[in-house]
């Protein structure tokens, strides 16, 4: 590799590194520094204040309804703890 091609490769590499280090990701609706634009916030508050409820369509599949079913995580039978308690008391 001659000197001129090495210089070109180094300049390109430097340009890529500078671009990656100086770029900033802006999420949708957010301004730099994590600030949200006031207009979008007002629109969100207005939408929440209307009281509209989003419901599932009537022809929702059984799989979708099963996925959205509530789970009872508190009353799960506690079989592990019951076995451990019986083992410790023996």
From Swiss-Prot:
Molecular function in Gene Ontology: gonadotropin hormone-releasing hormone activity; gonadotropin-releasing hormone receptor binding
Keyword line: Amidation, Cleavage on pair of basic residues, Hormone, Pyrrolidone carboxylic acid, Secreted, Signal
Glycine amide: modified positions: 33
Superkingdom to which the source organism belongs: Eukaryota
Chief localisation class: secreted
Tissue specificity comment: Expressed in neuron cell bodies of the nucleus olfactoretinalis.
Ribosomal protein is among the record's keywords: no
One CC-aspect GO term: extracellular region
PROSITE patterns: GNRH
Pyrrolidone carboxylic acid PTM positions: 24
Pfam families the record matches: GnRH (PF00446)
Signal peptide: 1-23
Subcellular location, record wording: Secreted
Gene Ontology biological process terms from the UniProt entry: brain development; camera-type eye development
Its biological purpose: Stimulates the secretion of gonadotropins.
Similarity remark: Belongs to the GnRH family.
Misc: Teleost species possess three paralogous GnRHs: mdGnRH and cGnRH-II have been identified in tetrapods; sGnRH has no tetrapod ortholog and is thought to be a duplication of cGnRH-II.
Matching PANTHER family: GONADOLIBERIN (PTHR10522), PROGONADOLIBERIN-2 (PTHR10522:SF6)
Protein name: Progonadoliberin-3
Organism, scientific name: Oryzias latipes (Japanese rice fish)
Gene: gnrh3
């Amino acid at each position: 590799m001659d000197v001129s091609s090495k210089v070109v490769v180094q300049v390109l590499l430097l340009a890529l590194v500078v671009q990656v280090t100086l770029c900033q990701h802006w999420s949708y609706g957010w301004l730099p520094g994590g600030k949200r634009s006031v207009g979008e916030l007002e629109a969100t508050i207005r939408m929440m204040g209307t009281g509209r409820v989003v419901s599932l369509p009537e022809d929702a599949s059984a799989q979708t309804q099963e996925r959205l079913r509530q789970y009872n995580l508190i009353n799960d039978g506690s079989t592990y703890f019951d076995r451990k308690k019986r083992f410790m008391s023996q």
